From Swiss-Prot:
One of its GO terms (molecular function) is toxin activity. Coiled coil: none annotated. Expressed by the venom duct. The keyword Magnesium does not apply. Keywords: Bromination, Disulfide bond, Hydroxylation, Ion channel impairing toxin, Neurotoxin, Secreted, Signal, Toxin. The cysteine framework is XII (C-C-C-C-CC-C-C). Disulfide bonds join 45-57, 52-65, 59-70, 64-76. This is Mu-conotoxin-like Cal 12.2a. The modification 4-hydroxyproline is found at residues 48, 77. InterPro entries: Conotoxin. It comes from Californiconus californicus. It is found in: Secreted. GO terms for cellular component: extracellular region. Residues 1-19 form the signal peptide.
Length: 84
């Protein structure tokens, strides 16, 4: 009887195991928007329209406004106070 109860509980919990074991610090973030992800790096990037954004976006879809462009880590050089 106890074994049956344990098996039933495991069968109910197993489909949700990834929700329990997956943390938000891994690459497969849940509910994180590209805007939130872009705030990780500090630098100056260009939006698709070509205007500069001084909030530390990551160079993924547009080139940086900084003359040297993106570095090896695909992050814009410079800081928030840079005016290019």
């Amino acid at each position: 009887m106890k074994l049956t109860c344990v098996l039933v509980v495991l069968l109910l919990v197993l489909p949700f195991g990834d929700l329990i074991t997956t943390s938000n610090t891994e690459d497969n973030k849940r509910g994180a928007t590209p805007w939130q992800n872009s705030l990780k790096a500090r630098g100056v990037c260009s939006t698709p329209e070509g205007s500069c954004v001084h909030n530390g976006c990551i160079c993924q879809n547009a080139p940086c406004c900084h003359p040297s462009g993106c570095n090896w880590a695909n992050v814009c050089p410079g800081f928030l106070w840079d005016k290019n």
